[in-house]
Amino acid sequence: MAGTDSPAAARFVYRCLLFAPAIVVGLLLPLTLPPIAAAQRHTASDNPSTYNIGGVLSNSESETYFHTIISHLNFDQQYVPRKVTYYDKTIRMDKNPIKTVFNVCDKLIENRVYAVVVSHEQTSGDLSPAAVSYTSGFYSIPVIGISSRDAAFSDKNIHVSFLRTVPPYYHQADVWLEMLSHFAYTKVIIIHSSDTDGRAILGRFQTTSQTYYDDVDVRATVELIVEFEPKLESFTEHLIDMKTAQSRVYLMYASTEDAQVIFRDAGEYNMTGEGHVWIVTEQALFANNTPDGVLGLQLEHAHSDKGHIRDSVYVLASAIKEMISNETIAEAPKDCGDSAVNWESGKRLFQYLKSRNITGETGQVAFDDNGDRIYAGYDVINIREHQKKHVVGKFSYDSMRAKMRMNINDSEIIWPGKQNRKPEGIMIPTHLKVLTIEEKPFVYVRRMGDDEFRCEPDERPCPLFNATDSTANEYCCRGYCIDLLIELSKRINFTYDLALSPDGQFGHYLLRNNTGAMTLRKEWTGLMGELVNERADMIVAPLTINPERAEYIEFSKPFKYQGITILEKKPSRSSTLVSFLQPFSNTLWILVMVSVHVVALVLYLLDRFSPFGRFKLSHSDSNEEKALNLSSAVWFAWGVLLNSGIGEGTPRSFSARVLGMVWAGFAMIIVASYTANLAAFLVLERPKTKLSGINDARLRNTMENLTCATVKGSSVDMYFRRQVELSNMYRTMEANNYATAEQAIQDVKKGKLMAFIWDSSRLEYEASKDCELVTAGELFGRSGYGVGLQKGSPWTDSVTLAILEFHESGFMEKLDKQWIFHGHVQQNCELFEKTPNTLGLKNMAGVFILVGVGIAGGVGLIIIEVIYKKHQVKKQKRLDIARHAADKWRGTIEKRKTIRASLAMQRQYNVGLNSTHPPGTISLAVDKRRYPRLGQRLGPERAWPGDAADVLRTRRPYELGKPGQSPKVMVATPAMLGRTRPQQNILPPRYSPGYTSDVSHLVV
């Protein structure tokens, strides 16, 4: 088998070595080797005192140096503990991998090597190093390569214990990213072979770029990936696709032979001349036809075997020293034929090796998880005339920052076409597709009539393309942004086709489920979607610059600085029925009312108890004014307050008059203050806004009667999503959001929407145009409007510089005055604000109603007085009738008494003269009260008021006689008198001494 040198046999052996050991390792090792366990407690005496280090080297010189380094290592106490000695065991690398395997078993493993250092000549291929890795890895013996750079050695499923002090070829992708960031290139084309290393470098570039660009401002994107089969014969087909791409920066990984074919064909297509940039890997740099101006990379110390041998030995010694101090090291395996060997210490040693980080002869030596060298330095090579290689930069380790750093001297670079100036790296198109959107006053859109064939001079055609049937509706656009676009095209020299946003939206980020897709995918809609998907080159519209959009597109410097504000309708003047009461608060009105009556009461008391008041003056003239009563005092207090004339009822005492003067002064101040404030409230006052700004409590804690909204998917909508403190407000307003700003503004005018939150430029324009609208509070969320371009667009810097020049020249200020701030309209609004209101019925209706209430109150009171007076008159009339009846009855009684007295006198006279009647007889008219039973027998009499309820006085009708006649007198005999009842049951009659003249009880 030693004579198997043909390429076919070598490839066969390589495949066998590639797959067979992998299968064996994959199937047997999980069954025979337990997982790595933690080291147990040990002592220094448990570890071996001698360690054999194997070497599979490419030449005798390397073997000699390896022996020397091991000898010197034993005297370095920094790396070698006491009582520990290292010995070297070396063999020569054979081109035959099978022979190499046997040599490793017989000459290295049989001598208990703890690790193997392997190198080979670059021209011999990687079959022999792979054989060493397979064999040693099977027994968990670490292998340190110093020259193998293929990507296959990074696969730890196959090369389980392989490390290397050189980086793999595909690590050059890291240097590519640094170079692109340095030159600020944003679009690239990657050319790579379809082998393992070619695909590895592409994957490394794509993976690393995702995290690399988080720390830098300029992001490079891959516009085109060109993959070719090795052993090229022609590259023309791929060059055609590359020529139509926009990028002119080519990153190439290819072997030296393939690079020659690519450079040959690219030169024929004039793609290696001025304006093109080629950045290639180490192998391509050695092509014999590399064009002038090509940039390439070359690994530092790539061919310094001695340096790598020394670094690998010291890395190994450092790992063994730390392992000795931490755990017990078992002896290395000795029998290559024993497949059951499980050297756990070898696996642990491999982990210690990967964690090393030392400063070696080839630079900073450290490893990643795959055992590949990191912190490797590169030279940046510039190909000059006659294939001369000139170092123009270095990619080296910065010990202060503990990271790699790129340093390139741009002035020393000669670019393709022998140019000293860095190419743009991109083909700059001069005819652009520009999109805009209707948004007053920045863009006014007018549909063309059927008979119109062109727009007005200040307008530009802006068709609206239908996404479903690709038809276009013809429109004309003008406004702030259209004038800006016209001036930009003149200044930086490009032509354009203008069109409207297909869906009429600025665009927002949506999760969409594409047909047949299993997962959701985020996509931009509207203007943003057109630009991100490269269906447009530029957006000239009031497009707010925010982080969400800046992640996917480029923005120029702002052409208009603005913020977010709130638009609301001005509250109408409150012309209520009690408008005249507005100058004073309710509390003050109550105090004034109370003061009037308190002062009136005090005036009355002062005048009542003063010794100089009319109540105390006994000799006062009867012609003088009457004393001040309480009613007059109240009248006086009200009269002074209302400034009416006081004709009567003024206080007389000095103390009361002093109080009256003070009250008059108080009334003067109150009336003057009321008059002044009434004018301010009814004439000069302008209503304020309902909201104080975004921090208004009514917005933060939205009530049912307060509605606020913005445009869904807009930059304002994104702003509210970002602000945590506005989350409650956003959840409330999200359901009210509108599709367009125009709809929301119309609803504000109609009163359907209380607050519309939008860009300040648009809302200030609306407020200046309509005096009924006003912006509330200060600006918040300050940002700006910018021109949107594709990521990496070559026009970004030119547009930015042009906009800055426009600001300096005053052109932007001119656009502001022309389109946003309508001076005459705003002046009219200010004049309207300052003009006093003419008082109308609405303003003073309350006063008239107050007068009406007074009149109605007076009428009501007079009706009550009339009714009361009628009642009093009726009562008085009844009293008069009763009094008249009583007087008449009294007269009758007196008359009867007189008659009876005269009759008694006559009877006495007759008795005395004639003695006709027997003694003891009296007139019943006189003694009837003493003999009621006699009266009862004589017949019933009338009942008189004043008699007891149970006693009836009887009076015989004939007793009174006829009118004009004297009553008849009945003479009672002693027998009749003897049948009388006891005296106690008799009540006195009206004419008895108990009689009273009060007749009020007679009134019914």
Swiss-Prot record:
The keyword Cell membrane applies. Glycans are attached at N270, N326, N357, N409, N466, N493, N513, N705. Keywords: Calcium, Cell membrane, Disulfide bond, Glycoprotein, Ion channel, Ion transport, Ligand-gated ion channel, Magnesium, Membrane, Phosphoprotein, Postsynaptic cell membrane, Receptor, Signal, Synapse, Transmembrane, Transmembrane helix, Transport. GO terms for cellular component: NMDA selective glutamate receptor complex; postsynaptic density; postsynaptic membrane. Residues 980-1004 are annotated as: Disordered. Residues 994-1004 have a biased composition (Polar residues). The keyword NADP does not apply. GO terms for molecular function: glutamate-gated receptor activity. It is found in: Cell membrane; Postsynaptic cell membrane; Postsynaptic density. InterPro entries: ANF_lig-bd_rcpt, CaM-bd_C0_NMDA_rcpt_NR1, Glu/Gly-bd, Iono_Glu_rcpt_met, Ionotropic_Glu_rcpt, Iontro_rcpt_C, NMDA1-like_ligand-bd, NMDA1-like_N. Residues 1-39 form the signal peptide. One of its GO terms (biological process) is ionotropic glutamate receptor signaling pathway. Glycine binds at P542, L543, T544, R549, S715, D759. Pfam families: ANF_receptor, CaM_bdg_C0, Lig_chan, Lig_chan-Glu_bd. It is a multi-pass membrane protein. Its main location: membrane. The chain crosses the membrane at residues 586-606, 664-684, 844-864. Residues 607-663, 865-1004 are cytoplasmic. Forms a heteromeric NMDA channel with Nmdar2. PANTHER family: IONOTROPIC GLUTAMATE RECEPTOR. Belongs to the glutamate-gated ion channel (TC 1.A.10.1) family. NMDA receptor subtype of glutamate-gated ion channels with high calcium permeability and voltage-dependent sensitivity to magnesium. Mediated by glycine. This protein plays a key role in synaptic plasticity, synaptogenesis, excitotoxicity, memory acquisition and learning. It mediates neuronal functions in glutamate neurotransmission. Is involved in the cell surface targeting of NMDA receptors. Plays a role in associative learning and in long-term memory consolidation. This is Glutamate [NMDA] receptor subunit 1.
